[in-house]
Amino acid sequence: ACAKEVIESGKFSLLEEKQLQQDETWGYLCSENEYISSLYVYDMEEGRSDVFFGEESSMRCYISDARRSVVFGSPGVDIDWRNQNMFVLKTGETKYYVGKYQGVNRIPLLKLSEMYLIAAEASGDKSWLQTLRDHRGYVNYPLADDCDLTAEIEAEYRKEFIAEGQLFYYYKRLNYDKLPGMSEPMAKHYVFPMPDNELEFGNIK
């Protein structure tokens, strides 16, 4: 109910295809239209983006063509606006890196797209998911009437929250034993260890 209330408030709007023609980065366009709550980091590019997304850094967040094909699937790898606009390929390189935080100083905490995913999951109504997909390039690819809605929602989470950390909490909430593509059980990783200072000074046993 709360997700629908946010959507229907009219205060936020999903990206339109015409907005992609602007000379702006994907991160900037999303932050201006779809961010409900975010953190402003004044030195995002200088202090952080250069490390994880900069041209010369050895710690860049790379993603290979093969991995992109797995994440976006078919026909998404060819039509998905995120796949087309969110990654950067530098001259002479074969791997893309995430360009989501180029030209923007905001880290998303809550986005309108997540409201659509929550509404779809809570109601079981695939029209909420289809609306989000329409605003990501899938307007000519409607979901099948008999689609596995849970699987489709998970696939959308994997595409929508790249380099944001939100997917971890989706898996944690659903208590996935193992993450896709991984063999190690996740149970022990869902709860972070208590900080040493908390144990020492917090009277915690």
Feature map (PLM): residue ranges:
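Acidic/polar-rich alpha-helix caps and helix-coil junctions
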Residues: 1-55, 72-205
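Acidic/Gly/His-enriched mid-domain segments of enzyme catalytic cores or analogous surface patches
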Residues: 64
